[in-house]
Swiss-Prot record:
PANTHER family assigned to the protein according to its UniProt record, in alphabetical order: 30S 40S RIBOSOMAL PROTEIN, SMALL RIBOSOMAL SUBUNIT PROTEIN US4M
Keyword list, A-Z: Ribonucleoprotein, Ribosomal protein, RNA-binding, rRNA-binding
Entry keyword rRNA-binding: yes
Family label: Belongs to the universal ribosomal protein uS4 family.
Single GO molecular function: structural constituent of ribosome
Upper lineage: Bacteria, Pseudomonadati, Pseudomonadota, Betaproteobacteria, Burkholderiales
Pfam families reported in the protein's UniProt record: Ribosomal_S4, S4
Organism the protein comes from: Paraburkholderia xenovorans (strain LB400)
Name under which the protein is recorded: Small ribosomal subunit protein uS4
PROSITE patterns: RIBOSOMAL_S4, S4
Chain intervals with Polar residues compositional bias: 42-53
Domain of life: Bacteria
Gene: rpsD
Subunit-level organization: Part of the 30S ribosomal subunit. Contacts protein S5. The interaction surface between S4 and S5 is involved in control of translational fidelity.
Amino acid sequence: MARYIGPKAKLSRREGTDLFLKSARRSLADKCKLDSKPGQHGRTSGARTSDYGTQLREKQKVKRIYGVLERQFRRYFAEADRLKGNTGENLLQLLESRLDNVVYRMGFGSTRAEARQLVSHKAIMVNGVVSNIPSMQVKAGDVVAVREQKKKQARILEALSLAEQGGLPSWVAVDSKKFEGTFKQKPERSDIAGDINESLIVELYSR
């Protein structure tokens, strides 16, 4: 599947917020001006953004946060709409339950892109079985672990250290000494970044 491989900071500048595409080793605010759009002097426009434009920007932002392309994102939305409950919250839970995201949330990867690479390179096991499918849906009670021969990788050790300093989500339990974690449950909406407005995405796809 094709993926964006250009400058990650540029995407965050485009959205005007940190999308957490880069490692927390250094604050993104120190690397670039998030309140300035990409371009030599930052693109400016006096035109008011339409409702459609606002909805589209929110969808693009969420796609970039989770590293998902349009076709797959549409499938997630269709599944979220089919499930009982709030469609927007269902969508975020599906995205948060992706294996690459869970690996990132457990602190084995410093970014979602790094976590996706660990999965693709068969460094991760789910319930004792190697999985190289980043989009795999992790279920409550599943145990996600780093393979024995990969535990000494410097990037994994550094990512775990950073994650422990920053704090781990309440919906995962991690044993850093064993390099494994348990997916306790799907996160509640309050557990997910508050700067995402999923209702705008629902409005966009409901047009």
